[in-house]
A protein has these predicted regions:
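His/Asp/Glu-enriched short active-site or ligand-binding loop at hydrolase and phosphoryl-transfer sites
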Residues: 161-203, 235-245
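Extended hydrophobic blocks
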Residues: 194-195, 209, 213-214, 220-222, ...
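Active-site beta->alpha N-cap acidic-glycine motif
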Residues: 33-116, 120-123, 131, 135, ...
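Alpha-helical structural signal in soluble globular domains
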Residues: 73, 77-81, 102-109, 142-146, ...
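N-terminal pre-catalytic segment of deacetylase/amide-hydrolase enzymes
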Residues: 1-60, 67-74, 80, 100-104, ...
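CE4/NodB-like, metal-dependent polysaccharide N-deacetylase domain
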Residues: 79-86, 113, 129-163, 197-212, ...
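Acidic-and-aromatic substrate-binding clefts and catalytic sites of carbohydrate-active enzymes
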Residues: 65-69, 90-99, 122-127, 156-162, ...
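A cross-domain feature marking catalytic cores of carbohydrate-active enzymes
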Residues: 62-64, 89-91, 116-118, 157-159, ...
Length: 245
C-alpha cells in the first residue's frame, strides 16, 4: 500500500492499543543471558541478507518503530530476557525519542544496536538522489544525537527496495552494508499471534537475519513463545555489531 496509507494505518492501530499492552510485555518469557560472541569479522561491502558461517547465531532485526508502546515493550523485553537485537530506526517516529531513556542504557551496553532505516520510510527509488541523501543523513544525525551512534555501516532501505545509485549515496555516508533479511515474523500487517509464532518457527534458524517490526501490538503478546522457541533450538541472539566489527 502507499507509504502514507501504511503510516496512517499503523498510527491508528497503535493509538488504540496503548492500554492493552501496558501490562508486563515479557510475561511468560524465559530469562536467558546470552554470551557475547567472540571473534568478529569485517562487515561486507554490499548486500547482507544472512549471517556468515555455520554457527547457532540468530540476528533479530526490528524495523520502523511506529508505536510508542510497542517500542517500549521491546525495551522491556530486552531488559527482562537479555535478548540481543538490532533496531532499524525511522527517526521521524516519536517512539525513539519517547523511549530513549529506556533504550540508551541497552545501546550503551551493546545489548541493543541502532541502525539506519531512513528518516521517514519512503520508497527511495521514487525520490531524487538528493532527497535520498537527506533521508539517510537526517536519520544519522538523529541517531547520533539521541543514542550516540549513527549505526554505520548498516543501512536497511525501506521495503528492501534499493539500486546501485541508492547504495552509492548510502555508502558515501558510511553505510556500506545494505542489510536485508533471510526470514520474517510476518508482522508488517495485522496478524494473529498464532500466525506470528508459526512464521517465527520457520524463520528462527541458525545464521538467519530475521525481520520484525515495532509497529503493531500483536508481537508483544508473543514474547514468551518466541523466547522459548529460541531457547529450544539453542540459538544465540546477536546484534550485527556482535558479528561484524
Amino acid at each position: 500500500m502507499p507509504h502514507v496509507d501504511r503510516r496512517t494505518l499503523l498510527w491508528a492501530i497503535a493509538a488504540g492499543v496503548v492500554a492493552a499492552i501496558s501490562r508486563a510485555p515479557s510475561s511468560g518469557a524465559v530469562p536467558i543471558r546470552w554470551k557475547i560472541p567472540e571473534g568478529r569479522i569485517p562487515p561486507p561491502a554490499g548486500v547482507l541478507a544472512r549471517l556468515p558461517g555455520d554457527g547457532n547465531q540468530l540476528a533479530l532485526t526490528v524495523d520502523d518503530g511506529a508505536s510508542v508502546p510497542v517500542v517500549g515493550a521491546f525495551a522491556q523485553f530486552c531488559r527482562d530476557t537479555g535478548t540481543r537485537l538490532t533496531f532499524f530506526v525511522n527517526g521521524a517516529n516519536p517512539s525513539w525519542s519517547v523511549n530513549a531513556a529506556a533504550l540508551r542504557p541497552l545501546v550503551d551496553s551493546g545489548q541493543v544496536q541502532m541502525a539506519n532505516h531512513t528518516w521517514s520510510h519512503p520508497y527511495l527509488n521514487r525520490m531524487k538522489l538528493t532527497a535520498v541523501d537527506d533521508q539517510i543523513r537526517r536519520n544519522a544525525d538523529f541517531l547520533r544525537n539521541t543514542y550516540g551512534t549513527d549505526g554505520a555501516p548498516f543501512f536497511r532501505p525501506p521495503y528492501g527496495v534499493h539500486n546501485a545509485d541508492i547504495d552509492r549515496v548510502a555508502a558515501d555516508q558510511g553505510y556500506t552494508t545494505v542489510t536485508l533479511w533471510s526470514g520474517s515474523v510476518g508482522d508488517s500487517a495485522p496478524e494473529n499471534e498464532a500466525a506470528l509464532v508459526a512464521n517465527a518457527a520457520k524463520a528462527f534458524q541458525p545464521q538467519q537475519i530475521v525481520l520484525t517490526h515495532a509497529n503493531l501490538p500483536t508481537i508483544t503478546h508473543c514474547y514468551g513463545q518466541l523466547t522459548n522457541l529460541i531457547a529450544s533450538r539453542n540459538l544465540q541472539t546477536v546484534t550485527l555489531n556482535d558479528v561484524f566489527g
